[in-house]
Amino acid sequence: MTYFKQIEKINYEGVQSGNRFAFRHYNPEEVVLGKSMKEHLRFAVAYWHTMTQDGSDPFGAATNVRDVSGKTEMELARNRVEMFFEILEKLGVEYFCFHDVDIAPEGNSLQEFMRNLDEITDLIQDKMKQTGIKLLWNTANLFTHPRFLNGAASTNNADVYAFSAAQIKKGLDISKKLGGKNYVFWGGREGYESLLNTDMEFEQANMARMYKMAIRYANEIEHEVQFLIEPKPKEPTKHQYDFDAATTMAFLQKYGLENDFKLNLEANHATLAGHTFEHELNVARTYNALGSIDANQGDLLLGWDTDEFPTNIYDTTLTMYEILQNGGIAPGGINFDAKVRRTSFEMEDLLLAHIAGMDTYARGLKAAAKLTEDHFFDKIKEERYRSFKKGIGARILDNQEDFKSLTEYALAHDSIQNESSHIEYVKSRLNDYLV
């Protein structure tokens, strides 16, 4: 069955195109800094928002019109796979991501859930072979079912801990089966609502124990996969242990996991943590831990995870600049963890929204490439820190100074002159690259 009969494959037509179903900026084969756009951007579509989100919210019923159905839950799951791969092919996107519960019903037992996953991943595997589309990452949903109300790896219930381990094990089996290059952990319920009844050290140690089991199991089945943790400060849990990039790196370092994990960073999660997305990316780069990103944007006027499609060129420019400075994002990618607005309820909006996001990231890439070629930020930073290039500054960096010698220097040079940062000019010049 064809779900988008009236829509042809989305092609690049240029900025003058009036065709809604065409890329105006994303030209997959266009070479930027020696690589094609599709190599730089490594776009992926998220199964959950694309196939299971229905447009409902806490105040209103579902609005999304989706021409996919089934007489049983499994028939619906199979039909969703067909529709999903049609979307990927229409967009020319080469990667996808999913949670286990996105693709198959849980049934009445863990055993039934695993059988359902086997059947659906057989179908997905066939579609991957037919299309050449690849799995960017998968993960286990350890937050929706009521059993996870007190967490999965951080739970106070040993039976829940065992169930969670079984679900992760199956996720890694599926990752190997489908050739996944990354596996994600997002701890939506790994945290606390009150410290009054929480042993934080115990819970975090159990989380680390679970991660180490995952590493060992991946080695046992000879599956080379990049493990990723996705930070988020809150929602659904009041305080989540993977609050932001820096907090997550502190956790990984404490438990000796920093060489086994990188970060999957999401723009809207950065907003909730009180950071810009480029801040989180820069922190991850500092730790050599930038693994993959979830592309979306939040609303600064709202206090929750709105998961909007990215349309802000300023943000995507600074995002792509960090990725270029990182030497790229592979084997990770740019996954659109974004959902259409409740008012964008038609089937075609799924394609239009992804086109908007892909075009916005393409514009960000081109602007970031120009910033890189011009050494725009490099020159500014070189000038700003030039006092450390010679004299006392150079000696400090060479570890030739100590408190005594620096005190002697300060006493002899106590008339200090600072220089203006001219930051308004810098921001204005940055705008020149965003055309």
UniProtKB/Swiss-Prot annotation:
Catalytic function, reaction form: alpha-D-xylose = alpha-D-xylulofuranose
Cofactor note: Binds 2 magnesium ions per subunit.
Enzyme nomenclature, EC number: 5.3.1.5
Active-site feature positions: 99, 102
Cellular localization per UniProt: Cytoplasm
Binding site for Mg(2+) 2: 266, 269, 305, 307
GO molecular function annotations of the record: magnesium ion binding; xylose isomerase activity
Listed cofactors: Mg(2+)
GO biological processes: D-xylose metabolic process
Domain of life: Bacteria
UniProt-annotated binding residues for Mg(2+) 1: 230, 266, 294, 337
GO CC aspect terms: cytoplasm
Keywords of this entry: Carbohydrate metabolism, Cytoplasm, Isomerase, Magnesium, Metal-binding, Xylose metabolism
Main subcellular location of this protein, as a coarse class: cytoplasm
Protein family (similarity comment): Belongs to the xylose isomerase family.
HAMAP family associated with the record: Xylose_isom_A
PANTHER family, per the entry: PTHR48408, XYLOSE ISOMERASE
Assembly mode: Homotetramer.
Stated name of the protein: Xylose isomerase
